[in-house]
Amino acid sequence: MAFPCYEDYRSAPLTIVRMLPMSDAHNVLITEFYTAFQHLDAEAMAACYTDDVVFSDPAFGELRGRDAGDMWRMLTTRAKDFSLVFDHVRSDDTTGSAHWVATYLFSATGNTVVNDIGARFVFRDGKICEHHDHFDLWRWSRQALGTKGLLLGWTPLVRNAVRAQALKGLKAFQAGR
């Protein structure tokens, strides 16, 4: 969803949110989140979250509060050959969902990844307080890690190694800020 009548795309959704019924406002919030992601604007993404947000996905596990925003800051800062599309944005007064596909160059191997993700949200006070992304980690590891991911990506050993590496990268990013 574009907001051509606004010079700054980030100003439109928050203004509109205050005038819409909650389910519509939550659809706008989800749209704002992914539009910011398309622009690699992690600050606008993090602004959609409550301070105590709970985020989870198969790569990072569960992140809380600032760690969730910092994950997006790290990923958007490091993004190479990145594109994102999203659709199926739905919500009611308390929950929402969306589907998104990110295509990017995985820097550790130079492989292109097309990650197909389902997202679920819980809202509180007009912001996202829970965000749970779901994707096939084996499919991701086959693309990102090549043969190693194809042969071993389904094993707990590789799954745990992916999570440990993701968290190590996040901690290093946070230490360098």
Sequence positions of predicted segments:
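A solvent-exposed, acidic/Ser-Thr-rich amphipathic alpha-helical stretch
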Residues: 42-46, 50-96
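Hydrophobic alpha-helical core bundles mediating ligand binding, dimerization, or RNAP-core interactions
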Residues: 30-37, 49, 68, 72, ...
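Short, low-complexity N-terminal intrinsically disordered segments enriched in polar/charged residues
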Residues: 11-47, 164-177
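A beta-strand edge to alpha-helix "cap/lid" segment located at domain peripheries
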Residues: 76-177
